[in-house]
Amino acid sequence: MKNLFEQSRSHWVRYDHYELKTAKDGKRYITPGKDTKPEVYNPLKEVPGIVLDALNVGMLMMSRSPAVEVERAVLKFVTRYGLLGLMTALPTTPAFMDYEAVYLPKNHFLKEESMDTDRYLALFYPFDQLDLVKRGIESAWKVSEDRTMVALTMTFMDEPMAKTMSFQRQYAEPYDWVAQQFKDWAFTLTTSILYYQDYRLIDQDTRELYQKAMAAFGGIAPSYHIELLDKPTIYWDFHSLLLGIQMMFSFMLVDEEHPLRLCKNCQKAFLGSHVNTTFCSPQCKNQYNVHKLSLIHISEPTRPEPI
C-alpha cells in the first residue's frame, strides 16, 4: 500500500489560514481568511496522516465531544490540508459548468436531483460572488486582478473550470457539511471494525445491516494517467479532496499488512502492526490497564482489618 502512494501524485490547494463566517441566513461557512496565501501541494504525500486526521475528527463527533472541540479539530484539519472541494465532489461530473444545469446523485446534503447552475454556485459563494456569466452551456469567468489568484488560475487552466473556481479566496463550504463528512468516514471505519469484532455475537439481520451500511460507502472513481518523471508515476485526477481521501481510505481499509484500528483506550484511529493490535501506543495501553485495575479495586468489598 505504501508503494502505491509513493509512486503516485496529485495536486490540491490549501491556504495558510481559514475562518468560520456566518452568512445572512445564519448558516456557518469555512472560508480562507482575508489576504491569506495559497499553496499547491500533493495530498498523496500526506498518507496515512491525512486519512487518520480525517477519521479522528469524525471520531470526536461519534463520541459526542463538545462542539467547541470538534470545531477546533475541523479548522485544524482544513488549515493543514485545505477544504474538501464539496462543490466538485457532489455533482455527477466536476465539469458541470459545461452543462445547462448541475446534476446530483443521492447525497446527505442536497435533496434535489438537479439544480440551476447559479443557484448551486450560490451555495459555495455566500459572501462574495465570482465575476461569472452563465448562459446555457456557455460560461465566462473574469478572474480578479489579484496576481496570486491569476497565477493559481493559470496553474489549473487545464482542469475543469469549477475545480479552479473552488481554489479562489471567495470559495466557502458549509461547516455542517464538512463536519458531517468527517463523521460519515468515522462511521464507516467503526462499522467495518465492529462487524468483524462482534461477528459471532450478532445475528444474521444485524450482519446484513452492517453489510448494507458498508455497501453505501463509495464514490465516483477518479481518473488517472501515467507520467514519465524520474520513474513512471501515477497521476490521480482528483477533482475534490473528498474524493482523494475517500480513495486513500478505501485502500487503507482493505490493507491487511497495516490494518486500520480504533484504540481501545482513547478511541483514536491508527494503523496497527497486525490485525489484533488494540492500542495506538504503549502509553494508552498502560492507561487502560491502570484504569481497569482501579475499577477492580473499587468493586472489591473492603475487608475488615484483623484485630
Predicted features, each with a name:
Residues 274-287:
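Cysteine-rich micro-motifs
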